[in-house]
Regions:
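Active-site neighborhoods and metal-handling regions in enzymes and metal-associated proteins
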Residues: 21-535
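Positively charged n-region of N-terminal signal peptides that target proteins for export
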Residues: 1-6
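Bacterial N-terminal signal peptides
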Residues: 7-16
Length: 535
Protein backbone atom coordinates (compact mmCIF):
# COMPACT_ATOMS: atom_id res chain seq x y z
CA UNK A 1 0.00 0.00 0.00
CA UNK A 2 2.86 2.38 0.85
CA UNK A 3 4.34 1.89 -2.62
CA UNK A 4 0.98 2.51 -4.28
CA UNK A 5 0.54 5.75 -2.35
CA UNK A 6 4.09 6.82 -3.19
CA UNK A 7 3.70 6.22 -6.91
CA UNK A 8 0.33 7.96 -6.80
CA UNK A 9 2.07 10.97 -5.32
CA UNK A 10 4.86 10.84 -7.88
CA UNK A 11 2.37 10.90 -10.72
CA UNK A 12 -0.01 13.40 -9.14
CA UNK A 13 2.49 16.04 -8.06
CA UNK A 14 2.89 16.87 -11.71
CA UNK A 15 -0.73 17.88 -12.19
CA UNK A 16 0.42 21.43 -12.74
CA UNK A 17 -1.44 24.47 -14.10
CA UNK A 18 1.85 25.60 -15.64
CA UNK A 19 1.34 23.35 -18.67
CA UNK A 20 -0.21 24.94 -21.77
CA UNK A 21 -3.25 23.50 -23.52
CA UNK A 22 -2.92 20.77 -26.16
CA UNK A 23 -2.08 21.80 -29.72
CA UNK A 24 -1.64 19.90 -32.95
CA UNK A 25 -0.24 20.64 -36.40
CA UNK A 26 -2.62 19.67 -39.20
CA UNK A 27 -1.87 18.82 -42.85
CA UNK A 28 -3.20 22.29 -43.65
CA UNK A 29 -0.45 23.82 -41.50
CA UNK A 30 2.28 22.00 -43.41
CA UNK A 31 0.67 22.75 -46.77
CA UNK A 32 0.57 26.45 -45.90
CA UNK A 33 4.32 26.30 -45.27
CA UNK A 34 4.94 24.73 -48.68
CA UNK A 35 2.78 27.40 -50.29
CA UNK A 36 4.64 30.16 -48.47
CA UNK A 37 7.93 28.68 -49.67
CA UNK A 38 6.69 28.44 -53.26
CA UNK A 39 5.59 32.06 -53.19
CA UNK A 40 9.14 33.20 -52.41
CA UNK A 41 11.03 30.81 -54.70
CA UNK A 42 12.64 32.28 -57.84
CA UNK A 43 10.99 31.89 -61.22
CA UNK A 44 11.24 28.41 -62.77
CA UNK A 45 12.92 26.95 -59.69
CA UNK A 46 12.53 23.74 -57.73
CA UNK A 47 13.33 22.89 -54.10
CA UNK A 48 14.45 19.37 -53.19
CA UNK A 49 14.68 18.21 -49.57
CA UNK A 50 15.80 14.83 -48.26
CA UNK A 51 14.86 13.19 -44.98
CA UNK A 52 17.45 12.75 -42.25
CA UNK A 53 19.57 9.59 -42.39
CA UNK A 54 19.14 6.78 -39.89
CA UNK A 55 22.24 7.07 -37.70
CA UNK A 56 24.05 4.10 -36.21
CA UNK A 57 24.76 3.96 -32.48
CA UNK A 58 26.83 0.77 -32.44
CA UNK A 59 26.90 -2.56 -34.24
CA UNK A 60 23.27 -3.39 -35.17
CA UNK A 61 21.68 -0.71 -32.95
CA UNK A 62 20.60 2.61 -34.44
CA UNK A 63 19.78 5.85 -32.68
CA UNK A 64 16.10 6.71 -32.32
CA UNK A 65 15.18 8.37 -35.60
CA UNK A 66 14.65 12.12 -35.57
CA UNK A 67 13.14 13.72 -38.69
CA UNK A 68 14.87 16.62 -40.38
CA UNK A 69 13.14 19.75 -38.99
CA UNK A 70 12.77 21.44 -42.37
CA UNK A 71 11.38 18.27 -43.94
CA UNK A 72 8.90 17.86 -41.10
CA UNK A 73 7.95 21.56 -41.20
CA UNK A 74 6.96 21.26 -44.85
CA UNK A 75 5.30 17.83 -44.74
CA UNK A 76 4.43 16.57 -41.25
CA UNK A 77 6.11 13.32 -42.35
CA UNK A 78 8.35 11.62 -39.77
CA UNK A 79 9.75 8.60 -41.64
CA UNK A 80 13.24 8.19 -43.13
CA UNK A 81 14.22 7.31 -46.72
CA UNK A 82 12.06 10.02 -48.27
CA UNK A 83 12.25 13.02 -50.60
CA UNK A 84 10.15 16.17 -50.98
CA UNK A 85 10.09 18.15 -54.23
CA UNK A 86 8.42 21.57 -54.37
CA UNK A 87 8.01 23.27 -57.77
CA UNK A 88 7.65 26.99 -58.29
CA UNK A 89 5.50 26.45 -61.37
CA UNK A 90 2.77 23.79 -61.72
CA UNK A 91 3.85 20.54 -63.37
CA UNK A 92 1.68 18.25 -65.49
CA UNK A 93 1.05 14.50 -65.48
CA UNK A 94 -1.78 12.16 -66.49
CA UNK A 95 -3.77 13.19 -63.39
CA UNK A 96 -3.47 16.91 -64.03
CA UNK A 97 -1.39 19.66 -62.44
CA UNK A 98 0.67 19.38 -59.27
CA UNK A 99 3.15 21.55 -57.40
CA UNK A 100 4.75 19.13 -54.95
CA UNK A 101 5.75 15.47 -54.69
CA UNK A 102 6.57 13.27 -51.71
CA UNK A 103 8.53 10.05 -52.28
CA UNK A 104 8.21 7.53 -49.44
CA UNK A 105 9.18 4.01 -48.40
CA UNK A 106 7.06 1.11 -49.54
CA UNK A 107 5.06 -0.90 -47.01
CA UNK A 108 6.92 -4.01 -45.81
CA UNK A 109 5.04 -6.23 -43.32
CA UNK A 110 8.16 -8.18 -42.31
CA UNK A 111 10.22 -5.06 -41.54
CA UNK A 112 7.27 -3.33 -39.93
CA UNK A 113 6.89 -6.24 -37.52
CA UNK A 114 10.41 -5.55 -36.25
CA UNK A 115 10.79 -1.80 -36.60
CA UNK A 116 7.34 -0.22 -36.59
CA UNK A 117 4.61 0.68 -39.03
CA UNK A 118 5.13 2.71 -42.19
CA UNK A 119 2.54 4.95 -43.77
CA UNK A 120 3.35 3.92 -47.31
CA UNK A 121 1.89 5.80 -50.26
CA UNK A 122 -1.74 5.43 -49.21
CA UNK A 123 -1.14 6.56 -45.64
CA UNK A 124 1.07 9.48 -46.66
CA UNK A 125 -1.59 10.79 -49.05
CA UNK A 126 -3.45 12.04 -45.98
CA UNK A 127 -0.67 14.62 -45.53
CA UNK A 128 -2.05 16.64 -48.43
CA UNK A 129 0.95 16.63 -50.78
CA UNK A 130 -0.23 16.72 -54.41
CA UNK A 131 1.59 13.54 -55.46
CA UNK A 132 2.79 10.76 -53.17
CA UNK A 133 4.94 8.11 -54.85
CA UNK A 134 7.25 5.30 -53.91
CA UNK A 135 10.85 6.38 -53.35
CA UNK A 136 11.94 4.10 -56.21
CA UNK A 137 10.06 6.41 -58.58
CA UNK A 138 12.42 9.25 -57.67
CA UNK A 139 15.28 7.23 -59.14
CA UNK A 140 13.31 5.83 -62.09
CA UNK A 141 11.74 9.14 -63.12
CA UNK A 142 15.08 10.66 -64.15
CA UNK A 143 13.67 14.17 -63.76
CA UNK A 144 15.96 16.59 -65.55
CA UNK A 145 16.57 19.04 -62.74
CA UNK A 146 19.01 20.99 -64.90
CA UNK A 147 16.02 22.23 -66.90
CA UNK A 148 15.13 24.54 -64.00
CA UNK A 149 16.70 27.95 -63.58
CA UNK A 150 17.60 27.16 -59.96
CA UNK A 151 17.61 23.97 -57.89
CA UNK A 152 17.34 24.91 -54.21
CA UNK A 153 18.88 22.42 -51.78
CA UNK A 154 20.59 22.10 -48.43
CA UNK A 155 24.18 20.96 -48.28
CA UNK A 156 24.28 17.17 -48.13
CA UNK A 157 25.15 15.48 -44.85
CA UNK A 158 28.23 13.26 -44.89
CA UNK A 159 26.92 10.52 -42.59
CA UNK A 160 24.56 8.72 -44.96
CA UNK A 161 25.26 4.98 -45.07
CA UNK A 162 24.77 2.83 -48.16
CA UNK A 163 22.61 -0.23 -47.53
CA UNK A 164 23.85 -2.59 -50.24
CA UNK A 165 20.65 -4.63 -49.93
CA UNK A 166 18.42 -1.63 -50.63
CA UNK A 167 18.79 -0.06 -54.10
CA UNK A 168 16.45 2.80 -53.16
CA UNK A 169 17.82 3.85 -49.78
CA UNK A 170 18.65 7.45 -48.91
CA UNK A 171 22.22 6.98 -50.14
CA UNK A 172 20.99 5.97 -53.60
CA UNK A 173 18.30 8.65 -53.68
CA UNK A 174 20.94 11.30 -52.99
CA UNK A 175 23.54 9.74 -55.29
CA UNK A 176 21.14 9.81 -58.24
CA UNK A 177 20.16 13.40 -57.52
CA UNK A 178 23.76 14.58 -57.09
CA UNK A 179 24.65 13.15 -60.49
CA UNK A 180 21.66 14.93 -62.00
CA UNK A 181 22.69 18.37 -60.73
CA UNK A 182 26.48 17.90 -61.08
CA UNK A 183 27.11 18.13 -57.35
CA UNK A 184 30.90 17.85 -56.80
CA UNK A 185 32.13 14.95 -54.70
CA UNK A 186 34.44 17.31 -52.78
CA UNK A 187 31.87 20.10 -52.45
CA UNK A 188 32.81 22.86 -50.00
CA UNK A 189 29.88 25.12 -49.19
CA UNK A 190 31.96 28.09 -48.06
CA UNK A 191 34.24 27.88 -51.11
CA UNK A 192 31.20 27.62 -53.39
CA UNK A 193 29.62 30.71 -51.84
CA UNK A 194 32.81 32.75 -52.03
CA UNK A 195 33.43 31.80 -55.66
CA UNK A 196 29.88 32.85 -56.56
CA UNK A 197 30.50 36.16 -54.78
CA UNK A 198 33.72 36.70 -56.74
CA UNK A 199 31.87 36.00 -59.99
CA UNK A 200 29.14 38.57 -59.30
CA UNK A 201 30.82 41.25 -57.15
CA UNK A 202 30.68 44.85 -58.35
CA UNK A 203 33.80 47.01 -58.26
CA UNK A 204 32.39 49.09 -55.39
CA UNK A 205 32.27 45.95 -53.20
CA UNK A 206 35.58 44.29 -54.14
CA UNK A 207 37.48 45.52 -51.07
CA UNK A 208 34.65 44.50 -48.74
CA UNK A 209 34.61 41.02 -50.26
CA UNK A 210 38.40 40.76 -49.96
CA UNK A 211 38.19 41.63 -46.27
CA UNK A 212 35.51 38.98 -45.75
CA UNK A 213 37.51 36.31 -47.61
CA UNK A 214 40.69 37.22 -45.73
CA UNK A 215 38.82 36.65 -42.47
CA UNK A 216 37.81 33.16 -43.59
CA UNK A 217 41.25 32.43 -45.05
CA UNK A 218 42.86 33.14 -41.69
CA UNK A 219 40.72 30.43 -40.13
CA UNK A 220 40.35 27.91 -42.95
CA UNK A 221 43.37 26.49 -44.77
CA UNK A 222 41.33 25.11 -47.68
CA UNK A 223 40.06 28.64 -48.41
CA UNK A 224 43.49 30.21 -48.01
CA UNK A 225 45.08 27.73 -50.44
CA UNK A 226 42.36 27.71 -53.11
CA UNK A 227 44.00 28.91 -56.38
CA UNK A 228 41.08 31.02 -57.61
CA UNK A 229 40.54 32.65 -54.23
CA UNK A 230 44.28 33.37 -53.91
CA UNK A 231 44.25 35.00 -57.34
CA UNK A 232 41.37 37.22 -56.28
CA UNK A 233 43.04 38.27 -53.03
CA UNK A 234 46.32 39.00 -54.81
CA UNK A 235 44.75 41.05 -57.63
CA UNK A 236 45.52 44.75 -57.28
CA UNK A 237 42.68 46.17 -59.37
CA UNK A 238 39.29 47.35 -58.09
CA UNK A 239 37.59 45.06 -60.60
CA UNK A 240 37.81 41.29 -60.92
CA UNK A 241 40.21 40.55 -63.81
CA UNK A 242 38.59 38.94 -66.85
CA UNK A 243 40.83 35.87 -66.73
CA UNK A 244 39.84 35.31 -63.09
CA UNK A 245 36.16 35.66 -63.98
CA UNK A 246 36.66 32.97 -66.63
CA UNK A 247 38.49 30.75 -64.13
CA UNK A 248 35.67 31.06 -61.59
CA UNK A 249 32.99 30.55 -64.24
CA UNK A 250 34.71 27.34 -65.31
CA UNK A 251 34.86 26.09 -61.71
CA UNK A 252 31.13 26.73 -61.29
CA UNK A 253 30.24 25.43 -64.75
CA UNK A 254 27.17 23.20 -64.93
CA UNK A 255 26.56 23.26 -61.19
CA UNK A 256 22.78 23.50 -61.19
CA UNK A 257 22.07 24.15 -57.56
CA UNK A 258 21.97 26.76 -54.81
CA UNK A 259 22.76 25.74 -51.21
CA UNK A 260 22.06 29.13 -49.59
CA UNK A 261 18.65 30.40 -50.66
CA UNK A 262 16.48 27.54 -49.37
CA UNK A 263 17.77 28.01 -45.83
CA UNK A 264 17.20 31.75 -46.07
CA UNK A 265 13.62 31.36 -47.28
CA UNK A 266 12.76 28.79 -44.63
CA UNK A 267 14.61 30.84 -42.01
CA UNK A 268 12.27 33.75 -42.70
CA UNK A 269 9.30 31.45 -42.14
CA UNK A 270 10.50 29.45 -39.17
CA UNK A 271 11.65 32.40 -37.07
CA UNK A 272 8.07 33.70 -36.87
CA UNK A 273 5.79 31.23 -35.10
CA UNK A 274 2.14 30.61 -35.86
CA UNK A 275 -0.53 30.33 -33.16
CA UNK A 276 -0.20 26.53 -33.29
CA UNK A 277 3.57 26.63 -32.95
CA UNK A 278 3.42 29.05 -30.03
CA UNK A 279 1.00 26.69 -28.27
CA UNK A 280 3.36 23.73 -28.79
CA UNK A 281 6.34 25.73 -27.55
CA UNK A 282 4.39 26.90 -24.51
CA UNK A 283 3.65 23.26 -23.76
CA UNK A 284 7.32 22.27 -24.08
CA UNK A 285 8.36 25.26 -21.96
CA UNK A 286 5.71 24.57 -19.33
CA UNK A 287 6.88 20.97 -19.00
CA UNK A 288 10.48 22.14 -18.62
CA UNK A 289 9.47 24.71 -16.00
CA UNK A 290 7.84 21.99 -13.90
CA UNK A 291 11.05 19.98 -14.19
CA UNK A 292 13.10 22.89 -12.86
CA UNK A 293 10.69 23.52 -9.99
CA UNK A 294 10.48 19.90 -8.90
CA UNK A 295 14.26 19.52 -8.95
CA UNK A 296 14.60 22.61 -6.76
CA UNK A 297 12.34 20.91 -4.20
CA UNK A 298 13.98 17.50 -4.54
CA UNK A 299 17.64 18.62 -4.54
CA UNK A 300 19.84 17.09 -1.85
CA UNK A 301 23.61 17.61 -1.48
CA UNK A 302 24.41 13.94 -2.10
CA UNK A 303 22.53 13.79 -5.40
CA UNK A 304 24.61 13.19 -8.52
CA UNK A 305 24.31 15.16 -11.72
CA UNK A 306 22.76 12.10 -13.36
CA UNK A 307 20.07 11.80 -10.67
CA UNK A 308 19.13 15.44 -11.24
CA UNK A 309 19.02 14.83 -14.98
CA UNK A 310 16.77 11.84 -14.36
CA UNK A 311 14.23 13.87 -12.39
CA UNK A 312 13.98 16.44 -15.17
CA UNK A 313 13.57 13.80 -17.85
CA UNK A 314 11.00 11.87 -15.79
CA UNK A 315 8.91 15.03 -15.70
CA UNK A 316 9.31 15.44 -19.46
CA UNK A 317 8.04 11.95 -20.16
CA UNK A 318 5.24 12.20 -17.62
CA UNK A 319 3.79 15.07 -19.64
CA UNK A 320 4.19 13.35 -23.00
CA UNK A 321 7.47 14.86 -24.18
CA UNK A 322 9.11 11.83 -25.76
CA UNK A 323 12.59 13.33 -25.99
CA UNK A 324 14.89 16.09 -24.84
CA UNK A 325 15.48 18.81 -27.40
CA UNK A 326 19.25 18.46 -26.94
CA UNK A 327 21.60 16.53 -24.62
CA UNK A 328 20.84 17.56 -21.05
CA UNK A 329 23.49 19.73 -19.38
CA UNK A 330 23.69 19.20 -15.61
CA UNK A 331 26.97 20.40 -14.12
CA UNK A 332 28.06 20.80 -10.50
CA UNK A 333 30.81 23.21 -9.46
CA UNK A 334 33.51 23.64 -12.10
CA UNK A 335 31.62 21.35 -14.47
CA UNK A 336 29.19 24.24 -14.91
CA UNK A 337 32.05 26.21 -16.48
CA UNK A 338 32.02 23.82 -19.48
CA UNK A 339 29.32 25.36 -21.65
CA UNK A 340 28.14 22.12 -23.27
CA UNK A 341 29.00 19.73 -20.43
CA UNK A 342 27.03 16.51 -20.98
CA UNK A 343 28.92 13.83 -19.03
CA UNK A 344 26.61 14.41 -16.04
CA UNK A 345 28.46 11.75 -14.02
CA UNK A 346 29.76 13.75 -11.03
CA UNK A 347 28.44 14.26 -7.50
CA UNK A 348 30.34 17.42 -6.65
CA UNK A 349 30.62 19.05 -3.24
CA UNK A 350 27.75 20.01 -0.94
CA UNK A 351 28.53 23.71 -1.38
CA UNK A 352 28.62 23.56 -5.18
CA UNK A 353 26.18 25.23 -7.48
CA UNK A 354 24.30 22.98 -9.92
CA UNK A 355 23.76 24.40 -13.41
CA UNK A 356 20.83 22.73 -15.18
CA UNK A 357 20.29 23.47 -18.89
CA UNK A 358 17.50 21.24 -20.19
CA UNK A 359 14.56 21.43 -22.56
CA UNK A 360 11.64 19.12 -23.24
CA UNK A 361 10.88 18.42 -26.88
CA UNK A 362 7.13 18.27 -27.39
CA UNK A 363 5.76 17.26 -30.80
CA UNK A 364 9.07 18.32 -32.33
CA UNK A 365 9.27 21.74 -30.63
CA UNK A 366 11.88 22.26 -27.94
CA UNK A 367 12.21 24.46 -24.89
CA UNK A 368 15.61 25.69 -23.65
CA UNK A 369 15.72 26.74 -19.99
CA UNK A 370 18.64 27.05 -17.57
CA UNK A 371 18.64 27.51 -13.83
CA UNK A 372 21.58 27.44 -11.42
CA UNK A 373 20.88 26.44 -7.82
CA UNK A 374 22.90 25.64 -4.68
CA UNK A 375 23.15 21.92 -3.91
CA UNK A 376 22.75 22.54 -0.19
CA UNK A 377 19.86 24.98 -0.63
CA UNK A 378 21.75 28.17 0.27
CA UNK A 379 23.87 30.46 -1.90
CA UNK A 380 27.20 31.55 -0.44
CA UNK A 381 27.96 35.28 -0.39
CA UNK A 382 30.31 34.94 -3.38
CA UNK A 383 27.72 32.91 -5.29
CA UNK A 384 25.04 35.52 -4.56
CA UNK A 385 27.21 38.33 -5.90
CA UNK A 386 27.92 36.54 -9.19
CA UNK A 387 24.32 35.36 -9.47
CA UNK A 388 23.02 38.90 -9.07
CA UNK A 389 25.21 40.15 -11.91
CA UNK A 390 23.90 37.42 -14.22
CA UNK A 391 20.32 38.11 -13.13
CA UNK A 392 20.68 41.85 -13.74
CA UNK A 393 22.19 41.14 -17.16
CA UNK A 394 19.29 38.88 -18.03
CA UNK A 395 16.73 41.43 -16.86
CA UNK A 396 18.33 43.99 -19.18
CA UNK A 397 18.41 41.46 -22.02
CA UNK A 398 14.75 40.51 -21.63
CA UNK A 399 13.74 44.18 -21.54
CA UNK A 400 15.55 44.64 -24.86
CA UNK A 401 13.78 41.68 -26.50
CA UNK A 402 11.40 43.76 -28.59
CA UNK A 403 10.30 43.94 -32.20
CA UNK A 404 13.17 45.38 -34.25
CA UNK A 405 15.90 44.42 -31.81
CA UNK A 406 18.46 41.70 -32.64
CA UNK A 407 20.30 38.86 -30.95
CA UNK A 408 23.48 40.90 -31.26
CA UNK A 409 21.96 43.87 -29.44
CA UNK A 410 20.74 41.68 -26.59
CA UNK A 411 24.17 40.09 -26.33
CA UNK A 412 25.90 43.49 -26.17
CA UNK A 413 23.49 44.76 -23.51
CA UNK A 414 24.11 41.73 -21.30
CA UNK A 415 27.86 41.99 -21.89
CA UNK A 416 27.88 45.56 -20.61
CA UNK A 417 26.16 44.55 -17.37
CA UNK A 418 28.47 41.57 -16.85
CA UNK A 419 31.60 43.59 -17.63
CA UNK A 420 30.74 46.33 -15.15
CA UNK A 421 29.83 43.78 -12.49
CA UNK A 422 33.06 41.80 -12.87
CA UNK A 423 35.12 44.99 -12.62
CA UNK A 424 33.19 46.03 -9.52
CA UNK A 425 34.04 42.72 -7.83
CA UNK A 426 37.69 42.95 -8.87
CA UNK A 427 37.52 39.78 -10.97
CA UNK A 428 38.70 41.66 -14.06
CA UNK A 429 40.65 44.90 -14.22
CA UNK A 430 39.10 46.32 -17.40
CA UNK A 431 35.65 45.90 -18.89
CA UNK A 432 36.99 44.59 -22.20
CA UNK A 433 38.28 41.48 -20.38
CA UNK A 434 34.75 40.16 -19.73
CA UNK A 435 34.98 37.48 -22.46
CA UNK A 436 37.29 35.47 -20.22
CA UNK A 437 34.25 34.67 -18.09
CA UNK A 438 31.35 35.30 -20.49
CA UNK A 439 32.36 33.84 -23.86
CA UNK A 440 29.03 33.21 -25.61
CA UNK A 441 26.09 35.02 -27.16
CA UNK A 442 22.96 35.75 -25.18
CA UNK A 443 20.07 34.97 -27.54
CA UNK A 444 18.91 32.53 -30.19
CA UNK A 445 15.61 31.43 -31.68
CA UNK A 446 13.96 28.19 -30.54
CA UNK A 447 11.44 26.00 -32.34
CA UNK A 448 11.89 22.71 -34.18
CA UNK A 449 15.60 23.13 -33.46
CA UNK A 450 16.98 24.29 -30.14
CA UNK A 451 19.02 26.77 -32.19
CA UNK A 452 16.21 27.32 -34.62
CA UNK A 453 16.63 28.18 -38.27
CA UNK A 454 16.61 31.95 -38.70
CA UNK A 455 18.36 34.68 -40.67
CA UNK A 456 19.02 36.51 -37.39
CA UNK A 457 17.90 39.90 -38.54
CA UNK A 458 15.66 42.25 -36.53
CA UNK A 459 13.11 40.40 -34.39
CA UNK A 460 9.55 40.16 -35.64
CA UNK A 461 6.43 39.66 -33.58
CA UNK A 462 5.78 36.02 -32.61
CA UNK A 463 9.43 35.03 -32.61
CA UNK A 464 10.46 33.05 -29.53
CA UNK A 465 14.03 33.48 -28.36
CA UNK A 466 16.22 32.65 -25.41
CA UNK A 467 17.92 35.23 -23.21
CA UNK A 468 20.83 33.50 -21.47
CA UNK A 469 23.76 35.44 -20.02
CA UNK A 470 26.25 33.61 -17.84
CA UNK A 471 29.48 33.89 -15.88
CA UNK A 472 31.89 30.97 -15.64
CA UNK A 473 34.99 31.05 -13.42
CA UNK A 474 36.86 27.73 -13.62
CA UNK A 475 39.59 26.70 -11.21
CA UNK A 476 42.96 28.41 -11.66
CA UNK A 477 41.38 31.50 -13.22
CA UNK A 478 43.40 34.75 -12.91
CA UNK A 479 41.32 36.07 -10.01
CA UNK A 480 40.88 35.55 -6.27
CA UNK A 481 40.41 31.77 -5.62
CA UNK A 482 37.24 32.49 -3.67
CA UNK A 483 35.49 32.86 -7.04
CA UNK A 484 36.83 29.62 -8.51
CA UNK A 485 34.34 26.93 -9.44
CA UNK A 486 31.39 29.29 -9.80
CA UNK A 487 29.47 28.77 -13.03
CA UNK A 488 26.09 30.47 -13.39
CA UNK A 489 23.72 30.79 -16.33
CA UNK A 490 20.09 31.91 -16.27
CA UNK A 491 18.14 31.19 -19.44
CA UNK A 492 14.52 31.90 -20.26
CA UNK A 493 12.31 31.55 -23.32
CA UNK A 494 10.82 34.87 -24.39
CA UNK A 495 7.98 35.59 -26.81
CA UNK A 496 8.45 38.77 -28.86
CA UNK A 497 5.19 40.73 -29.21
CA UNK A 498 4.16 44.14 -30.48
CA UNK A 499 3.48 45.10 -26.85
CA UNK A 500 6.82 43.90 -25.51
CA UNK A 501 8.52 40.70 -24.34
CA UNK A 502 6.70 37.90 -22.51
CA UNK A 503 8.85 35.54 -20.44
CA UNK A 504 7.08 32.21 -21.02
CA UNK A 505 9.31 30.36 -18.55
CA UNK A 506 9.02 32.90 -15.72
CA UNK A 507 7.33 30.38 -13.39
CA UNK A 508 10.69 28.72 -12.81
CA UNK A 509 12.16 30.89 -10.00
CA UNK A 510 14.93 33.20 -11.21
CA UNK A 511 16.04 35.32 -8.27
CA UNK A 512 18.36 33.70 -5.75
CA UNK A 513 15.87 34.53 -3.00
CA UNK A 514 12.99 32.76 -4.80
CA UNK A 515 15.18 29.73 -5.51
CA UNK A 516 16.19 29.38 -1.86
CA UNK A 517 12.56 29.70 -0.81
CA UNK A 518 11.32 26.98 -3.17
CA UNK A 519 14.17 24.67 -2.16
CA UNK A 520 12.77 24.68 1.39
CA UNK A 521 9.59 22.97 0.22
CA UNK A 522 9.16 19.22 0.52
CA UNK A 523 9.17 16.94 -2.51
CA UNK A 524 7.30 13.68 -3.15
CA UNK A 525 10.71 12.30 -4.07
CA UNK A 526 11.88 12.70 -0.47
CA UNK A 527 10.35 9.29 0.29
CA UNK A 528 11.40 7.63 -2.95
CA UNK A 529 13.93 5.17 -1.54
CA UNK A 530 15.23 2.43 -3.81
CA UNK A 531 16.65 -0.84 -2.44
CA UNK A 532 20.38 -1.48 -2.31
CA UNK A 533 21.65 -3.43 -5.30
CA UNK A 534 22.77 -6.94 -4.56
CA UNK A 535 25.73 -8.72 -6.15
Amino acid sequence: MHKLILFSLLFSFLGSPLIAQEAVLTPEFHKSKREALRAEMPANSVAVLFSNPVRNRANDVDYVYHPDPNFYYLTGFKEPQSVLVVYKNPQQDDLGQYVDQLFVQERDPAKEQWNGYRLGVEGAEALGVDRVLLRSEFIKSQTNFTSFEEVLIFEFKNDVRDDKNDPNDLYDLQRTFKENINYPQDFNRLRHRLLKSIRTVGKEDVETLKNEINWYAGRNESIAEDPAIKNFLESSTLEVPEDLKMQVAFLLKDQYFDVELLGQLLGDQREVKTVEEIALLKKAIGISVVGQREVMKAMRPDMSEREIQGIHEFVFKKYGAAYEGYPSIVGAGSNACVLHYIENDDVGMDSDLMLMDLGAEYEGYTADITRTIPKDGTFSEEQKLIYQIVYDAQEAGIEAAVVGSTSGQITRITQEVVAKGLVRLGIIAKEDEFRTYYPHGAAHHIGLDVHDLSNYGPFKANAIITVEPGIYIPKNSPCDPKWWGIGIRIEDDVLITEKGPINISANAPRTWEAIEELMKESSPLDQFLLPELGN
